[in-house]
């Protein structure tokens, strides 16, 4: 029997971030899965009245299915802490650090994890960034520091592409990060309660795993387990666990890497609230271990707690 059987569960989804549509899909899928397990579930689209709605619904535990700003950055976690409502996923500080790529990259380096060379630029200077500002040259990857789901991320191969890419990244949350492009195999690792579940290999139809490739069915191929030498898989899973611990995460995370030809796992980011849609990677990895989607959602729910 689940820890929260018989309790009123709110699945928090939607919200105001650029990842709202993905969150709506995640929340709907998770709510349906929890209902299949017999839980009393209410879906709440997070808005400025969410605190009053949580009280009105007499919510006893929250399943956080939000992505991006105001949901994955510690904001909703702080509200739930102040209302003494246990919730799934990471706490306020870990969520904030995981969301801010500038902060998380510094932490990864302090842990001894491999991080591709990068530069951070204020949003105000985005229009003046040139190739001469990049000691690692081209190709490079441009991204906003405070977004997820590859929102505002660009692969830049030519100098003429750099300015538009930086200006677009600056239109999103956070500073502009420009990092050296690492050629290799894209691999994501699911971590649940501090333990790596497995590593999945991602092969997009195009050269870059962007927003469309992530959320459009049929545009990307996945291989589980990842088609890498055993030693490389072991290294990437150990790095994922170290990143999960180093940020101070709880519950389930997805840690993204590029594994170079020599087996070095270059960490990209930790997703403290990974997608849980039909095309999402954590459910794919769990399914490969024989863990059904409803069982996975209940495992995540069982870990709900106050973290402050």
Curated annotation (Swiss-Prot):
Residues 105-302 form the ATP-grasp domain. GO terms for cellular component: cytoplasm. Mg(2+) 2 binds at residues 269, 271. One of its GO terms (molecular function) is metal ion binding. Mg(2+) 1 binds at residues 256, 269. It holds the Pfam family Dala_Dala_lig_N. Transmembrane segments: none annotated. Its EC number is 6.3.2.4. It is found in: Cytoplasm. ATP binds at residues 133-188. Its cofactor is Mg(2+); Mn(2+). It is an enzyme of class 6 (ligase). InterPro entries: ATP-grasp (IPR011761), ATP_grasp_subdomain_1 (IPR013815), D-Ala_lig_Van_CS (IPR000291), D_ala_D_ala (IPR005905), Dala_Dala_lig_C (IPR011095), Dala_Dala_lig_N (IPR011127), PreATP-grasp_dom_sf (IPR016185). PROSITE patterns: ATP_GRASP, DALA_DALA_LIGASE_1, DALA_DALA_LIGASE_2. Belongs to the D-alanine--D-alanine ligase family. Cell wall formation. This is D-alanine--D-alanine ligase. It comes from Anaeromyxobacter sp. (strain K). The gene is ddl.
């Amino acid at each position: 029997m689940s820890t929260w059987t018989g309790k009123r569960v709110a699945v928090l989804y939607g919200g105001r971030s650029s990842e709202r549509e993905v969150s709506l899909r995640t929340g709907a899928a998770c709510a349906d899965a929890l209902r299949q397990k017999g839980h009393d579930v209410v879906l709440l689209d997070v808005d400025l009245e969410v605190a009053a709605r949580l009280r009105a619904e007499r919510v006893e535990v929250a399943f956080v299915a939000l992505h991006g700003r105001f949901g994955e950055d510690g904001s909703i976690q702080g509200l739930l802490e102040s209302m003494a409502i246990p919730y799934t996923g990471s706490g306020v500080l870990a969520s904030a650090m995981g969301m801010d790529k500038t902060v998380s990259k510094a932490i990864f380096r302090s842990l001894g994890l491999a991080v591709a060379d990068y530069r951070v630029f204020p949003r105000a200077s985005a229009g003046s960034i040139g190739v001469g500002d990049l000691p690692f040259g081209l190709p490079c990857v441009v991204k906003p520091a405070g977004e997820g789901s590859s929102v505002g991320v660009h692969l830049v191969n030519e100098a003429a592409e750099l300015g538009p890419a930086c200006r677009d990244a600056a239109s999103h949350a956070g500073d502009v990060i420009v990092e050296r492009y690492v050629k290799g195999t894209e691999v994501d690792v699911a971590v649940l309660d501090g333990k790596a579940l497995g590593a999945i290999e991602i092969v997009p139809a195009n050269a870059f795993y962007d927003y469309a490739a992530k959320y459009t069915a049929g545009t990307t191929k996945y291989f589980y387990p990842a088609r890498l030498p055993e030693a490389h898989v072991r290294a990437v899973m150990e790095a994922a666990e170290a990143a999960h611990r180093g940020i101070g995460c709880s519950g389930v995370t997805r840690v993204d890497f590029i594994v170079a030809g020599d087996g070095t796992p270059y960490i990209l980011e930790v997703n403290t609230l990974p997608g849980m849609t039909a095309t999402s990677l954590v459910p794919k990895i769990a399914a490969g271990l024989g863990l059904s989607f409803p069982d996975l959602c209940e495992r995540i729910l069982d870990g709900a707690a106050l973290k402050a």
